[in-house]
């Protein structure tokens, strides 16, 4: 869809005759939606391409949407810079960290429900890599909350974003040290070139380089009067953190929200960003050679009809730039290791549990910084014995029992049974901690102690009239339990 917007008019004298003046109105229109595009060579900081807009250039020193003070909201393209990058760099998370994508509210006075782009869809336990790939909002907000918005804000400063608003410089009481910063909720927004320079820092092994538009200025005699050839640089991320973040964003391009951005014959990493009503659409990404950002939107913030073409435009431009370049690679640092983990906990897998999840094995192989690899075993998966009649923890008197492997959650809120009205996709495979201690009261327990050989847990007989005994949990994470409609592993009947 192409629209035209009137940005100015001029009354011009066309003819003079018989003492009268005939005039006409000359109008200039700007094609909409508009675009900005910038390309940097991350190894040098050289700015190679600047596109400030669509349409014919009809004025000198006109608006340049790539560099001028035309800040736009970045949407999810900010997530790697403010949440996941800092989280990896501080050791707060790994790419395998399991975050519960469930109904979640901002804290304090801003008690709004955090919604995902696909409204009402919550996936349950999801790794950081998967959350980044699918651009789920709740995990990003939870990560920023964990590291604190102040830390995320400080990283954005190091990434060179020039439009940030600190609490000390609040505009009408608004500033950027807030949880919603994880989703691009900024007071002013960002510029295209700032986003390109920030992503170039990730591509440059964590080192930020201030964009260089020229290297020197000569006088009429060829003497250098301004030397701009020495780049201004500083460290933002550890090399291992930058590589891990790059690996996560490669998944965004290979199987996530930016599959159309894949540059032929080059590894490609990046992140999409879309604001409410599609008023701002972004893709920021890089290859081993160049980093580029594209923004598409209406100058008057009108809603856009489609948001899929921007990644194709990005790819088309980048493929021309790379046409004569050999295939590169994102060189893996020596302190990166591969470890098998459980995708529902981010920890080392427990045999017989993590590999027997009713949805399929949850054992995955993930990359880690050597100094931040998991050492603890999964404590999310549990094997539970459930009374098929009451749905509670089976006691020794229950005659129909199902053995299931479920994932443990802290409360009913984490499976959506709160006032949000939503449920998580993994609800039927989950059990809350309170239900792990709720024993079946419909059946009389057997008069002698019995040990459940299927789960490795023991139910102990006592004289408690309400049949409520606390179930024991074995070292393997097994317990007699209840409260799910998940797949049955084994059903036993006690006579």
Where are the predicted features?
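Mid-domain, small-residue-enriched loop/turn segments at the edges of structured enzyme/sensor domains
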Residues: 112-117, 148-195
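Ser/Thr/Gly/Pro-rich low-complexity, disordered linker/stalk segments of secreted
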Residues: 445-495
């Amino acid at each position: 869809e192409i629209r035209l917007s009137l940005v100015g008019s001029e009354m011009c004298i066309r003819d003079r005759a018989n003492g009268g003046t005939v005039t006409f109105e000359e109008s200039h229109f700007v094609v909409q939606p508009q675009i900005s595009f910038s390309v940097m060579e991350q190894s040098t900081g050289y700015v190679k391409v600047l596109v400030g807009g669509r349409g014919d250039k009809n004025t000198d020193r006109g608006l340049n949407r790539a560099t001028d003070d035309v800040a736009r909201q970045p949407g999810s393209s900010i997530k790697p810079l403010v949440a996941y990058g800092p989280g990896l760099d501080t050791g707060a998370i790994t790419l395998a960290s399991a975050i519960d994508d469930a109904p979640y509210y901002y804290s304090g006075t801003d008690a709004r429900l955090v919604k995902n782009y696909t409204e009402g869809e919550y996936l349950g336990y999801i790794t950081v890599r998967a959350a980044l790939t699918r651009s789920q909002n709740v995990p990003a907000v939870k990560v920023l909350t964990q590291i604190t918005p102040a830390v995320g804000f400080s990283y954005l400063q190091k990434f060179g974003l020039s439009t940030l608003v600190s609490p000390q410089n609040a505009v009408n009481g608004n500033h950027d040290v807030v949880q919603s910063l994880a989703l691009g909720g900024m007071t002013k927004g960002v510029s295209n070139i700032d986003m390109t320079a920030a992503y170039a820092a990730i591509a440059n092994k964590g080192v930020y380089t201030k964009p260089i538009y020229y290297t020197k200025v000569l006088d009429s005699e060829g003497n250098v009067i301004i030397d701009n050839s020495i780049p201004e640089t500083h460290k933002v991320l550890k090399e291992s953190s930058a590589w891990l973040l790059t690996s996560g964003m490669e998944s965004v391009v290979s199987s996530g929200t930016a599959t159309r951005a894949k540059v032929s014959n080059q590894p490609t990493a990046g992140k999409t960003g879309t604001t409410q009503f599609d008023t701002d659409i972004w893709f920021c990404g890089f290859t081993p050679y160049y980093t580029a950002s594209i923004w598409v939107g209406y100058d008057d913030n009108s809603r856009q009809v489609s948001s899929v073409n921007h990644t194709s435009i990005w790819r088309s431009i980048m493929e021309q730039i790379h046409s004569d370049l050999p295939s590169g690679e994102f060189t893996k640092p020596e302190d990166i290791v591969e470890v098998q983990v459980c995708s529902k906990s981010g920890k080392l897998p427990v045999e017989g549990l993590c590999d027997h999840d009713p949805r399929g094995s949850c054992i995955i192989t993930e990359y880690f910084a050597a100094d931040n690899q998991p050492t603890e075993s999964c404590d999310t998966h549990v094997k539970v014995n459930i009374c098929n009649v009451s749905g509670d923890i089976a006691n020794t008197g229950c005659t129909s029992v199902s053995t299931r492997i479920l994932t443990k959650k802290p409360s009913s809120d984490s499976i959506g049974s709160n006032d949000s009205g939503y449920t998580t996709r993994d609800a039927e495979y989950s059990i809350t901690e309170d239900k792990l201690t709720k024993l079946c009261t419909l059946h009389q327990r057997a008069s002698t102690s019995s040990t459940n050989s299927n789960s490795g847990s023991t139910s102990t007989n006592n004289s408690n009239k309400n049949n409520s005994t606390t179930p024991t949990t074995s070292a393997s994470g097994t317990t007699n339990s209840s409260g799910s409609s998940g797949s049955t592993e084994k059903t036993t009947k006690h006579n």
